[in-house]
Swiss-Prot record:
Keywords: Metal-binding, Ribonucleoprotein, Ribosomal protein, RNA-binding, rRNA-binding, Zinc. Binds 16S rRNA, required for the assembly of 30S particles and may also be responsible for determining the conformation of the 16S rRNA at the A site. This is Small ribosomal subunit protein uS14. Part of the 30S ribosomal subunit. Contacts proteins S3 and S10. GO terms for molecular function: rRNA binding; structural constituent of ribosome; zinc ion binding. GO terms for cellular component: cytoplasm; small ribosomal subunit. PANTHER family: 30S RIBOSOMAL PROTEIN S14, SMALL RIBOSOMAL SUBUNIT PROTEIN US14M.
Length: 61
């Protein structure tokens, strides 16, 4: 199936609640989803580096 059809399928209410899964709203990626931000790791990193996520900064130690 194409990515767009899978995104539409993920938005529908499943027959059983355990079947529901999260997708990144920007790219539609189903894996590496960060619940706190509602993004996948790749989109999270891009937005954080551009300064679009308030309170997020690159760690350094």
């Amino acid at each position: 199936m194409s990515r767009t059809s899978l995104e539409v399928k993920a938005q529908r209410k499943p027959k059983f609640s355990a079947r529901a899964y999260n997708r990144c709203p920007i790219c539609g990626r189903p894996r590496a989803y960060l619940r706190k931000f509602g993004l996948c790791r790749i989109c999270f990193r891009n937005m954080a580096l551009r300064g679009e996520l308030p309170g997020v900064r690159k760690s350094s130690w």
